[in-house]
């Protein structure tokens, strides 16, 4: 067929090409959906068209641009899956030296596999990728695409390299992304975000509220709801396959990560994975962040001058599947969908079809995990299986106050030893943009500016900018208190690292674990589990190529500051055990708006009587002052998932009316058998927080301190977790009296998306504490 394909964001090139492939057989209605099994033994071919290649195996046909390494087209049995196409945040395009090559020639292996590569060599000069929020880099970048016989998709990977003759540099936000055809209308992230999406037209008609990525929908199935791209974030470790499918064409397209070793932030890193683009006619998109900056996890990737560094990102498998037979909704189902617009009842047939495609993608993820590391990746720093090691051991909990010695949902990983990032110092504070690159979050561009210099922004090259230099900012080049060039040094731990590889696994309840396929090196072993407050760590774990290393019994003795008096919830690094923190609810936009009506008198929680599942809200935020958000047509505006929000008007941001609240005080009541002495310690584990004046703590009317947590954007981005932190507040135990006691936690007045997201609270008492004790009040762990 004749197909016009544009280069989209990768350039102005457009080309027409003719594909001669077998059409996908028309699917048929059936009692249960059935996934299509690939039926071909066609050899893989690679064809050079001058400005682009095509890779074809009779199932998929991929078109790759030879300047940018962009995926211009991915045709599956005659059906185009791409809209804007696929690309890396930083690309080789624009490098002083650009080469492209066929790195695996199918003519040499009987058509078993083909691979093409585009490499940009900067020569140590800065290479700016146009329009990339993550900015540019000094690194050499090589982008590769590979396809095997019978592969229902294509593998994409990138190699970032910094030779010893290059200067100091950092890498901003970085990811691989595909922008899809608008036929994809069903999003699948996890069991709770496996759903029909609004249409691109509905998004385009929506009214912005609070931020450009949030819109109140005024039309369609989800009218009177807020669509927000951050509603579809996920912990990357827990979603090995995610993507979109089409309710009409019965095709799915997915990103499959066979491992997270090349991703930042380890086994608890939350990132964007699927959502709509932000413009008025958006493509559905899939993203794979390897250097993510969201939710307080501004991962660090700063390389010193003269440092020899490289990292292989991927291969990621872009998997495409379809249904050979499917379930069809009845007329009654479609009528019900139309009648319930706003808070829709979606046809069960659509969900069964989409779930079948998603579950098949998850099965494919297990296949890819078993194949990892791929034996066909060569010529880069990528050890094969026999060049890697395996680490085993058994963690044993040593805690006399623990209810059990079991370690449910044990997660164990190996990460680079904590290190101080490469650069420190203080950058300038000029804004502007005179002869300089802009600023903004994530890197070059979007505001800021420095005279003759590269400006800044969060997570990129710094806030503000500097004269003739790299500007200032958080996590970037320069600025007060930042993390990168000129930004003030900081210790980088596993939860904030993107520079090195990490290796994580699920352990067993009895503490046993096996970590396979570890690159040779020296690591720190980390572990956390449900029910255990804190984290285990063991240093100097050296892994050799081909070695099986048994660490034996590892005693895990969690920190205690005294005898436990009471607890609320249990530690698991999420808010899912608290009211509305469960998977069906937490990700929905607007719980800070609705909190004040759910708990009109705020919260009073009585230890031993209250139930944290329903009596403790998962986030403590200011108490809203306005009900102007309520849709009068909503049946249950406080609890229904969709359709509860007034639309508002395009010329007014409703957030200006509803977005602030008064101070919120929660009270915890508890009894003591007798008056106390020594030191008491409140331990607060936070799954997330957003910038505000702190969490003020009082005991029986006496203020004892303020916890000032690290901002993780968990509230602004409506999630139940950011980077996890524990905070402690010690106080004189003499404040505790025999009989009834009250502790109050207060969030100050302010914007509704300021406050905390709770994981767990515990009060401990050490009656033998001496003033010269080592416990430091209000310390963050």
Can you name each region flagged by the protein language model?
Residues 47, 90-163:
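Extended, loop-rich substrate-binding clefts of extracytoplasmic carbohydrate-active enzymes
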Residues 389-399, 511-513, 554:
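A short, amphipathic beta-strand motif
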Residues 511, 521-532:
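A short, solvent-exposed beta-strand micro-motif common in secreted/extracellular proteins
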Residues 652-653, 658-677, 685-780:
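Beta-strand-rich ligand-recognition modules
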Residues 530-553, 557-559:
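Structured interaction patches on ligand/partner-binding surfaces of diverse proteins
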Residues 420-428, 432, 484-512:
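Short, acidic Ser/Thr/Gly-rich low-complexity loop/linker segments typical of extracellular
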Residues 179-309:
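A contiguous, surface-exposed recognition patch within enzymatic or periplasmic domains that forms
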Residues 32-90:
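Beta-strand-rich N-terminal accessory domains
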């Amino acid at each position: 067929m004749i197909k016009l394909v544009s280069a989209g964001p990768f350039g102005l090139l457009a080309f027409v090409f003719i594909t001669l492939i077998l059409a996908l057989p028309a699917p048929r209605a059936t009692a249960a959906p059935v996934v299509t099994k690939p039926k071909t033994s066609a050899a893989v071919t690679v064809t050079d068209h001058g400005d682009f290649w095509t890779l074809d195996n009779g199932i998929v046909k991929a078109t790759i641009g030879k300047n940018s390494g962009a995926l211009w087209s991915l045709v599956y049995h005659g059906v185009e899956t791409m809209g804007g196409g696929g690309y890396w945040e930083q690309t080789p395009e624009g490098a002083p030296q650009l080469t492209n090559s066929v790195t695996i020639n199918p003519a040499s292996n009987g058509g078993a596999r083909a691979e093409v590569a585009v490499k940009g060599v900067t020569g140590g000069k800065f290479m700016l990728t146009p329009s990339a929020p993550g900015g540019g880099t000094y690194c050499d970048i090589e982008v590769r695409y590979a396809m095997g016989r019978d592969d229902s998709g294509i593998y994409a990977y990138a190699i970032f390299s910094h030779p010893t003759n290059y200067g100091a540099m950092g890498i901003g936000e970085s990811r691989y992304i595909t922008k899809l055809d608008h036929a994809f209308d069903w999003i699948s992230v996890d069991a709770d975000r496996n759903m029909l999406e609004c249409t691109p037209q509905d998004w385009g008609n929506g009214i912005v509220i609070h931020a450009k990525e949030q819109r109140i929908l005024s039309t369609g199935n989800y009218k009177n709801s807020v669509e927000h791209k951050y509603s579809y974030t996920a912990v990357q470790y827990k979603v090995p396959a995610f993507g979109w499918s089409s309710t009409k064409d019965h095709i799915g397209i997915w990103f499959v990560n066979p491992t997270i070793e090349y991703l930042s932030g380890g086994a608890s890193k939350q990132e964007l994975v699927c959502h709509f683009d932000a413009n008025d006619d958006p493509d559905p998109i899939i993203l794979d962040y390897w250097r993510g900056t969201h939710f307080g996890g501004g991962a660090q990737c700063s390389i010193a001058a003269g440092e020899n560094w490289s990292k292989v990102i991927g291969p990621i498998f872009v998997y495409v599947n379809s249904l050979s037979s499917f379930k069809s909704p009845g007329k009654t189902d479609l009528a019900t969908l139309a009648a319930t617009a706003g808070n829709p009842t979606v046809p069960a047939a659509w969900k069964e079809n989409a779930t079948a495609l998603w579950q098949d993608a998850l099965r494919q993820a297990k296949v890819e995990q078993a194949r990892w590391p791929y034996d066909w990746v060569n010529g880069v720093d990528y050890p094969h299986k026999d060049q890697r090691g395996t680490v085993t051991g058994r963690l044993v909990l040593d805690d006399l106050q623990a209810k059990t010695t079991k370690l449910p949902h044990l997660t164990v990983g190996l990460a680079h030893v904590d290190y101080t990032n490469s650069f420190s110092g203080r950058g300038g504070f000029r804004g502007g943009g005179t002869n300089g690159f802009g600023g903004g979050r994530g890197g070059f561009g979007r505001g800021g500016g420095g005279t003759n210099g590269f400006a800044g922004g969060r997570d990129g090259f710094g806030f503000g900018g500097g004269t003739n230099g790299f500007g200032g900012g958080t996590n970037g080049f320069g600025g007060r208190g930042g993390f990168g060039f000129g930004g003030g040094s900081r210790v980088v731990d596993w939860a904030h690292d993107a520079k090195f590889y990490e290796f994580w696994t699920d352990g067993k309840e009895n503490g046993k674990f096996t970590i396979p396929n570890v690159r040779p090196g020296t690591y720190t072993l980390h572990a956390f589990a449900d029910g255990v407050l804190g984290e285990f760590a063991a240093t100097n774990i050296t892994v050799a190529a081909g070695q099986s290393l048994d660490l034996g019994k590892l005693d895990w003795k969690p920190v205690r500051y005294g005898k436990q008096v009471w607890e609320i919830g249990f530690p698991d690094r999420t808010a899912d055990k608290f009211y509305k923190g469960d998977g069906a609810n937490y990700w929905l936009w607007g719980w800070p708006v609705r909190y004040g009506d759910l708990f009109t008198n705020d919260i009073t929680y009585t230890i031993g009587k209250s139930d944290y599942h329903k009596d403790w809200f998962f986030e403590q935020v200011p108490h809203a002052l306005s009900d102007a958000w309520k849709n009068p047509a909503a049946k249950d505006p406080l609890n229904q998932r969709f359709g509860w929000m007034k639309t508002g008007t395009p010329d007014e941001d409703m957030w200006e009316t509803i977005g602030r609240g008064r101070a919120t005080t929660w009270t915890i009541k508890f009894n003591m058998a007798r008056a106390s002495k020594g030191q008491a310690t409140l331990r607060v584990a936070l799954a997330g927080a957003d910038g505000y004046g702190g969490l003020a703590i009082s005991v029986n009317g006496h203020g004892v301190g303020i916890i000032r947590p690290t901002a993780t954007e968990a509230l602004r981005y409506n999630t139940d977790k950011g980077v996890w932190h524990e905070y402690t507040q010690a106080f004189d135990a003499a404040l505790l009296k025999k009989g009834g006691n009250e502790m109050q936690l207060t969030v100050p007045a302010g914007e509704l998306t300021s406050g905390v997201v709770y994981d767990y609270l515990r009060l401990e008492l050490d009656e033998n504490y001496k003033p010269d004790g080592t416990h430091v009040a209000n310390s963050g762990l």
